[in-house]
Amino acid sequence: MKVIAILISFFIFSSCYASDSTYTIKINFLYGSRPAKGYHQQESKRFGGIKGGHVNIEAGGRVLDFRPGNNPLLPNNKKPSGGFSINESIYWDSQTDKWTTVIVPVSQEQFMTLQNLIDSFAAKTPYDYAIFGMRCAAASYDVLSKIGLFKEYPNTKNVATHFYPKLLRKKVLKWAADNNYKIETHDGRTTRKWESDKGIL
């Protein structure tokens, strides 16, 4: 009887653990870019150029983006023109753009907290999008920190630390490698010059 009880306890624990570890979220990065030499007529400029790009968070078939409105230099949090939105998929071309996706296992509690944040932040953004303020990298870090994946920062420190996507991407890639999380990458088309992950900045 004792052996049977131990086996039952083991299977219950294994079942609960497996169930709790099946939740995953994606952190998606689009790399900054500009038209390659000789392709300025064919390719358009993009916001931010080489230091541009984008980052968003995907979970449960929904993508949370933080996008500009009137793109002010300084935020107007009382009347924000930009903010969070929910989309069905990433907006960039996954076949020809350069991107990286980090797949992160999370607990059921973290997953549900994220779903609630997606709903509440999309309904009412907690801050405005601004050139010298919260942008996609800092906003994404804020969301990830609120579900316990990273240390929470005050907005001022968050903005300074994650001023553009590459700064967050390098941190996330190192963190993912240290934790053996799955990383998917795709090289972009040669008609654009793409940002690399080399260098401090």
Go through each PLM region and give its residues.
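Generic structural signal for short, solvent-exposed loop/turn connectors between secondary structure elements
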Residues: 1-3, 17-19, 58-64, 148, ...
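Sec-dependent N-terminal signal peptides
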Residues: 3-14
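Residue-level detector of intrinsically disordered/flexible regions characterized by low predicted structural confidence
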Residues: 4, 28, 81, 172-173, ...
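Activation targets extended, charge/polar-rich intrinsically disordered C-terminal tails
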Residues: 19-23, 37-39, 43, 119-201
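Glycine-rich catalytic cores of cysteine/serine-nucleophile enzymes that process amide/ester linkages
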Residues: 20-101
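Solvent-exposed, acidic/flexible segments
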Residues: 49-52, 104-107, 111-114, 129-137
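Acidic/histidine-rich, surface-exposed loop or edge segments in extracytoplasmic proteins
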Residues: 93-100, 116-124
